[in-house]
Each structure stands twice: as structure tokens, then as C-alpha cells.
Amino acid sequence: LDLRGPKFGCGLGQCGACMVIVKGQATRSCVTTVASVAGSEITTLEGLGTVEKPHPIQQAFIDEQAMQCGFCVPGQILTAVALLRKTPKASREQIVEAMNGNICRCCN
């Protein structure tokens, strides 16, 4: 498939590096069976934007230099996209709660 967005991090569904969007929800792919998502639309980082025209959240990460090694960034971006699609005017508390499951190995 040549998809490089989802990463294999912990393999336990704890770090968020493997995040994809399934049915509008941020979903940890490392603990999700293929059978449970068969026939579902699945969005990876590659499905959001392009190098020439990044998704607004991708652009915000670029503008704010919100990355170091980049390993965790796809999961963080997909988590943010799923949250803001569901709750466009999310409160700070909702954002913190949603992003809490994404661990950055460089900074934590």
C-alpha cells in the first residue's frame, strides 16, 4: 500500500503512533482487527492533504514547528482532525482529553 503515515509504536494501543480515522473516529490501528473495519472508510495521513496543499491541521503543525523526529506526528494530526470534524469548536479541555492518548517519545 506504500502508506507511511501510521507507525507501529507500542503495539498495545497506548501511544497513538498507529492512529487512523475509521468512521470519523480516531482509531488505534495496532489493536484493531481487519474484520472489525471491513468495508469501512479508513483515512491515514496520506488521505488528508498533499505536499503542495497540506490539510489545515498539517499546515498548522508546520507553521508552529510542532515536531521533532516526526514519529508521533501522523497520529497527533489524525487525532486532531477527528476531534475537530466531530467538535469544530472544541474547548481546550476537549482538545487536551483527545490528544492525551498520543505520546511523543522525544518530549515525554
Predicted regions and their residues:
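Signature of N-terminal electron-transfer/Fe-S-associated modules in redox systems
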Residues: 1-108
